[in-house]
Amino acid sequence: NEFNTRNDLLATNFLLNTKNLNFNVMTATTCQNLQFDKANAFRNFKNDSLGYFLVNRWKNYKRWWTSIDPQQKKWIMWDLSIIEAIIHPEWATKKIFKTPIDNLQRDIKVYTSIDSSMMKKDFWEHYNKLN
């Protein structure tokens, strides 16, 4: 019952009902543990096109799904959490769950924990190698 699945129930059901699909799910509950602090991130973003893009995105993106943190002092790194989990599976734990009762009954893998410290460290190391 997460907002990503509620935004596109047809796509979610399609994936859940696809036989033999190796389906790995990074939940909002799990990836919320990988958050960047605004002050720290802004200090570390470079004065280049990527740095400007990231700062602008942070400042101007409207978080329509929540009213928590109106100053946007923290940012959950949704996409980075799944990318890091794929690249470094040792930094993530997956458990097997059954699909919901209304869907094709099969096992899917759900990320239940991530090593957010290692993921942050890896991001900044790679970011700092750019340019």
Language-model-detected regions and their locations in the chain:
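N-terminal acidic, glycine/proline-rich low-complexity segments
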Residues: 1-131
